[in-house]
């Protein structure tokens, strides 16, 4: 048997106010009398109430959620990228939904469709090459799209990364300019 989810009406009854007053307090605490707000806050704390963000998401068409697709949980680079993203999103009260597609374009496509179904406010992709269907879904979603890593090729919206070919070219030119024709590494 499923437990009863605590509702705004439950809080209103316990606080001796209307459901609308509780709703107003959750949205904008300063719009409610200080004493009333303190009473509502105390009750919410006592009963461990967690507001349901779904109605606000529907009303405002904003979820405060970003989708992130990474190709591997095994690569430390992506763990560092996720940590960097989280350090910014958490400060701005955004949540992240993370999907791993294991370098498989069809899996990436399914993950993009799934993330878009959560009404995400933006999406971060780890690569530049996607299925035609993925590109169509992303373009029709009209949300910000950021592609990470390699910046070669046509971008969907925004990109953050580097050009591997140009970096290799610059490296070889520098080596030749310095007359350094051999580079070795102590591979551990």
Range-by-range predicted roles:
Residues 32, 51, 71, 76, ...:
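Proline-centered helix-kink/hinge sites
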Residues 1-62:
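N-terminal helix-turn-helix DNA-binding module of bacterial transcription factors
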């Amino acid at each position: 048997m499923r437990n009863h989810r605590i509702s705004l009406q439950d809080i209103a009854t316990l606080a001796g106010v209307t459901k609308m007053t509780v709703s107003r307090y959750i949205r904008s605490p300063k719009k409610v009398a200080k004493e009333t707000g303190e009473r509502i806050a105390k009750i919410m704390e006592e009963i461990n109430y967690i507001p349901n963000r779904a109605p606000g998401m529907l009303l405002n068409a904003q979820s405060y959620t970003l989708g992130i697709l990474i190709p591997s949980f095994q690569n430390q680079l992506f763990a560092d990228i996720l940590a960097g993203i989280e350090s910014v999103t958490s400060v701005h009260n955004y949540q992240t939904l993370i999907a791993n597609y294991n370098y498989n374009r069809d899996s990436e496509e399914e993950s993009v469709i799934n993330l878009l179904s959560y009404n995400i406010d933006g999406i971060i992709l780890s690569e530049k090459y996607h299925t035609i269907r993925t590109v169509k879904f992303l373009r029709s979603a009209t949300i910000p799209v950021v592609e990470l890593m390699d910046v070669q090729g046509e971008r969907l919206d925004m990109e953050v990364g580097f050009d591997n070919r140009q970096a290799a070219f610059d490296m070889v030119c520098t080596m030749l300019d310095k007359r350094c024709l051999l580079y070795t590494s102590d591979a551990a």
